[in-house]
Amino acid sequence: MAKKNAKKSKNPPATIARNKRANFDYKFEEKFEAGLSLMGWEVKSIRVGKVNLSESYVFLRDGEAYLFGCTITPLNTASTHVVCDPMRDRKLLLNRRELDKLQGLVERQGYSIVPISMYWRKNAWVKLEIGLGKGKKEHDKRDDTKEREWKIEKSRTMKHAAR
């Protein structure tokens, strides 16, 4: 019998920030993991947790992907010789194949690229999970809310019936 040689990481990726509105406003068909091109003061601020992804999105320009609208608040002890811009556009590090796929779907079929979460990979690399999806209509959001409430109600009745 063949032995599986798969290494399982003991520590799951530590989440830094989540875009909670993303799953409510969009239906994602595919998710990607992208690296971020950051400056030193940004990494220090991220370690403290001063990141906000709520109003951010990803746009494609000149064949490259950029994170726009993500706020990384600089620390008070940040470097004095570097201008700290908390709202600057940050380049995403993706493979050419992934960039081409994203470019084609966004231009032709009207998909949106939205950041879902930011997390640490191997305690050294900041990664951004981005989702490729379409915006939900109002009735889709209501259906999701009804379904979620029905699951809660069903679990309550099963819990009380078991007593």
Swiss-Prot record:
Annotated stretches, region: Disordered: 135-163
Cellular location(s): Cytoplasm
Alphabetized InterPro entries for the sequence: SmpB, SsrA-bd_prot, SsrA-bd_prot_CS
Compositional bias of kind Basic and acidic residues: 135-156
Predominant localisation class: cytoplasm
Record key words, sorted: Cytoplasm, RNA-binding
GO molecular function, one term: RNA binding
GO biological process: trans-translation
PROSITE patterns assigned: SSRP
PANTHER family registered for this protein in UniProt: SSRA-BINDING PROTEIN, TMRNA-BINDING COMPONENT OF TRANS-TRANSLATION TAGGING COMPLEX
Protein name: SsrA-binding protein
